[in-house]
Amino acid sequence: MEPPTVPSERSLSLSLPGPREGQATLKPPPQHLWRQPRTPIRIQQRGYSDSAERAERERQPHRPIERADAMDTSDRPGLRTTRMSWPSSFHGTGTGSGGAGGGSSRRFEAENGPTPSPGRSPLDSQASPGLVLHAGAATSQRRESFLYRSDSDYDMSPKTMSRNSSVTSEAHAEDLIVTPFAQVLASLRSVRSNFSLLTNVPVPSNKRSPLGGPTPVCKATLSEETCQQLARETLEELDWCLEQLETMQTYRSVSEMASHKFKRMLNRELTHLSEMSRSGNQVSEYISTTFLDKQNEVEIPSPTMKEREKQQAPRPRPSQPPPPPVPHLQPMSQITGLKKLMHSNSLNNSNIPRFGVKTDQEELLAQELENLNKWGLNIFCVSDYAGGRSLTCIMYMIFQERDLLKKFRIPVDTMVTYMLTLEDHYHADVAYHNSLHAADVLQSTHVLLATPALDAVFTDLEILAALFAAAIHDVDHPGVSNQFLINTNSELALMYNDESVLENHHLAVGFKLLQEDNCDIFQNLSKRQRQSLRKMVIDMVLATDMSKHMTLLADLKTMVETKKVTSSGVLLLDNYSDRIQVLRNMVHCADLSNPTKPLELYRQWTDRIMAEFFQQGDRERERGMEISPMCDKHTASVEKSQVGFIDYIVHPLWETWADLVHPDAQEILDTLEDNRDWYYSAIRQSPSPPPEEESRGPGHPPLPDKFQFELTLEEEEEEEISMAQIPCTAQEALTAQGLSGVEEALDATIAWEASPAQESLEVMAQEASLEAELEAVYLTQQAQSTGSAPVAPDEFSSREEFVVAVSHSSPSALALQSPLLPAWRTLSVSEHAPGLPGLPSTAAEVEAQREHQAAKRACSACAGTFGEDTSALPAPGGGGSGGDPT
């Protein structure tokens, strides 16, 4: 498939339509972030069970989401943090009230649409028995994701108003609307309200009328000038709606409008990030290639040394024809990865263990499983106590907890046999995508299904499908990405036409295993139930393809915001499309839940995913392929990748889910913010990767150009806006205080308050700029002291030539530069907990190896010139590597 063509500016930016012929040029689409009165929204309960009768015990709602650690959260930073706009103080400090100004303070925003005019009656927050979004204005508040960042936020001038200034008082609480379709609905409702006011036509009481609010203003009470202004604003708002509706015809769905907008916003954010530093460029490329649905060009791997030798071997003589090719015994249609296992012979309904698996640590396992219904269950301990059978144990206990074995007449021995067979088809030698990850996603899905806002919403069959999908969603995962399989022309990629390769394979294996002996757990379902369950499972597992992330996010956010601007405020979920949309996003949230778990668990998952990435990078290096982003163990920045992953992927998703089930997911967001802050604080302490030119070594393919994103004309203009100046540069600090003040100067610049995503940009910029400034200052000062001319790095083709030239012109300069900069530049995080056995720890093994390599290179460069004592260099595990920075 050919890569998609670059969309035009009009198709990318729905809110930038050009004027029609013969029409006066309209103002740019209104420059504000949409704010609507907070509307009570609830999800319609649809019946909990497929059976007609339910026991009274089952009618009780599930317990709300609880934290497994059950710790006191009164002192947690996330709960004390007030809700900050994204970005916050970085973009101005203007004050004001977005709701008090009426039409006089009208602003315009190129992304979003017109401000609701003063004639519109706000909706009052009313109590609702179901799901209420932002019901209380005085609740704990936090930062918002980049989705709420407007085009005007890129303006660094002091005139730019902070979005904090537009938050209204408690009496006029508002929600922010960012999806295009919800904005059009809100705008049309505003036009309708203004029309009624201007014409004195009474508004009939129907679903389009506000549920509550102040008494409508009478036209007689308005001055002529006010009426004229209101009429002009109403006409302008209607014109904007027409422009948006004219562009809708090119889209398959209204949610795709939001998807295109979000992708464009993310591309713009990643473009800024990629320009900051090498590590920022790598993080940007990783996020773009993993979470944006793009068709990348297939890379043909260069032949290895053995293949070259085969090509150079003498061809057989004509008298000796080559042997005929061996035919493939395995047809393309055959599902690969299946094993012949025998678990059914030793199992029957009478000898099933208490927790579904045999263990000699039953009491310890029972203690851990007390947290089965809580967020943050320590799945690592469960696996240890269950003899490595965490997936079977968790699935068995959840089915018992929800009484699904009885409801669907699933034989217990069949259930356990299938789960043991399924778990055996997860690869134990894969660091992350193994049965432990599947068990974690399964338990997380179970907890999300039990959230009070979703009580009595989904049927038992839908719950069964969601749990089954979570259990099989990564079965037979080989530990490499879809793109790796495509680039290597694997059989799986050929079979599934490069589309969601692994996800299709997981489904095929999961359903194929049902055909094994005594493994069909759905044998007593009706034909219609089986067909319905299979369709739902396929939809949910395919949604775990991370390249579909932005589409899933846009679908969910459009659904939530559309209900925010409607007066009914009821999410009916009365059709398959809406119901499966919520279930798809639920499993997707569970699949991306690692950063929302307690920090000690999150760090273990990070160690595992990075180990898997590095293993893939090693395989790509062996094949002579370009190493995928974040897969090069010599250059990957673990902490920065996690901050970017949270800012651009995890936070927007969980923020939207929290809106859907408010307030049930608030503590999850608090944990996510705390974990993000921890990894952000670790950036300045972890060793920076060595120069990429040196780390790759000879014989490796050249580095690709800086990762670039397609920008529209509007976005290119924004790129010209200069970044805010850092208060104190490294050179000023060196001049004023000498080398002893360098570290304080760095602390001062990093301590500069900024928003989450902007913080990651600034740290990466500081890393590159400070390193360059310090190197220049060192060389200049030492060259002046020896009377030689300073050496310019760009006069040489490589860093090695530059170092040699400096050593000849000023040995003392190199003596200072080589050992000091790597040691001073960054310090690693203290290891409060050891890394996993056999896996690199984020700040211990991986970072110590980097520092050790940097020290060896510095030593080898110095040894032949001035005999520097190598004992002065920082050693791995010391103050400059994996040790405590204090």
UniProtKB/Swiss-Prot annotation:
<feature type="region of interest" description="Disordered">
    <location>
        <begin position="866"/>
        <end position="886"/>
    </location>
</feature>
<keyword id="KW-1003">Cell membrane</keyword>
<dbReference type="InterPro" id="IPR040844">
    <property type="entry name" value="PDE4_UCR"/>
</dbReference>
<feature type="compositionally biased region" description="Basic and acidic residues">
    <location>
        <begin position="51"/>
        <end position="78"/>
    </location>
</feature>
<feature type="binding site">
    <location>
        <position position="645"/>
    </location>
    <ligand>
        <name>3',5'-cyclic AMP</name>
    </ligand>
</feature>
<comment type="pathway">
    <text>Purine metabolism; 3',5'-cyclic AMP degradation; AMP from 3',5'-cyclic AMP: step 1/1.</text>
</comment>
<dbReference type="GO" id="GO:0071466">
    <property type="term" value="P:cellular response to xenobiotic stimulus"/>
</dbReference>
<feature type="active site" description="Proton donor">
    <location>
        <position position="433"/>
    </location>
</feature>
<keyword id="KW-0479">Metal-binding</keyword>
<keyword id="KW-0472">Membrane</keyword>
<dbReference type="Pfam" id="PF18100">
    <property type="entry name" value="PDE4_UCR"/>
</dbReference>
<feature type="region of interest" description="Disordered">
    <location>
        <begin position="682"/>
        <end position="705"/>
    </location>
</feature>
<dbReference type="GO" id="GO:0046872">
    <property type="term" value="F:metal ion binding"/>
</dbReference>
<dbReference type="GO" id="GO:0032587">
    <property type="term" value="C:ruffle membrane"/>
</dbReference>
<dbReference type="GO" id="GO:0007165">
    <property type="term" value="P:signal transduction"/>
</dbReference>
<dbReference type="GO" id="GO:0005654">
    <property type="term" value="C:nucleoplasm"/>
</dbReference>
<dbReference type="InterPro" id="IPR003607">
    <property type="entry name" value="HD/PDEase_dom"/>
</dbReference>
<keyword id="KW-0966">Cell projection</keyword>
<dbReference type="GO" id="GO:0007608">
    <property type="term" value="P:sensory perception of smell"/>
</dbReference>
<comment type="function">
    <text>Hydrolyzes the second messenger 3',5'-cyclic AMP (cAMP), which is a key regulator of many important physiological processes.</text>
</comment>
<keyword id="KW-0963">Cytoplasm</keyword>
<protein>
    <recommendedName>
        <fullName>3',5'-cyclic-AMP phosphodiesterase 4A</fullName>
        <ecNumber>3.1.4.53</ecNumber>
    </recommendedName>
</protein>
<feature type="modified residue" description="Phosphoserine">
    <location>
        <position position="346"/>
    </location>
</feature>
<feature type="region of interest" description="Disordered">
    <location>
        <begin position="1"/>
        <end position="128"/>
    </location>
</feature>
<feature type="modified residue" description="Phosphoserine">
    <location>
        <position position="688"/>
    </location>
</feature>
<keyword id="KW-0114">cAMP</keyword>
<feature type="binding site">
    <location>
        <position position="591"/>
    </location>
    <ligand>
        <name>AMP</name>
    </ligand>
</feature>
<feature type="binding site">
    <location>
        <position position="473"/>
    </location>
    <ligand>
        <name>Zn(2+) 1</name>
    </ligand>
</feature>
<dbReference type="GO" id="GO:0006198">
    <property type="term" value="P:cAMP catabolic process"/>
</dbReference>
<feature type="region of interest" description="Disordered">
    <location>
        <begin position="294"/>
        <end position="331"/>
    </location>
</feature>
<dbReference type="GO" id="GO:0019898">
    <property type="term" value="C:extrinsic component of membrane"/>
</dbReference>
<dbReference type="GO" id="GO:0048471">
    <property type="term" value="C:perinuclear region of cytoplasm"/>
</dbReference>
<keyword id="KW-0464">Manganese</keyword>
<feature type="binding site">
    <location>
        <position position="474"/>
    </location>
    <ligand>
        <name>AMP</name>
    </ligand>
</feature>
<feature type="modified residue" description="Phosphoserine">
    <location>
        <position position="686"/>
    </location>
</feature>
<dbReference type="GO" id="GO:0047555">
    <property type="term" value="F:3',5'-cyclic-GMP phosphodiesterase activity"/>
</dbReference>
<keyword id="KW-0862">Zinc</keyword>
<feature type="binding site">
    <location>
        <position position="474"/>
    </location>
    <ligand>
        <name>Zn(2+) 1</name>
    </ligand>
</feature>
<dbReference type="GO" id="GO:0106070">
    <property type="term" value="P:regulation of adenylate cyclase-activating G protein-coupled receptor signaling pathway"/>
</dbReference>
<feature type="binding site">
    <location>
        <position position="645"/>
    </location>
    <ligand>
        <name>AMP</name>
    </ligand>
</feature>
<dbReference type="InterPro" id="IPR023174">
    <property type="entry name" value="PDEase_CS"/>
</dbReference>
<dbReference type="Pfam" id="PF00233">
    <property type="entry name" value="PDEase_I"/>
</dbReference>
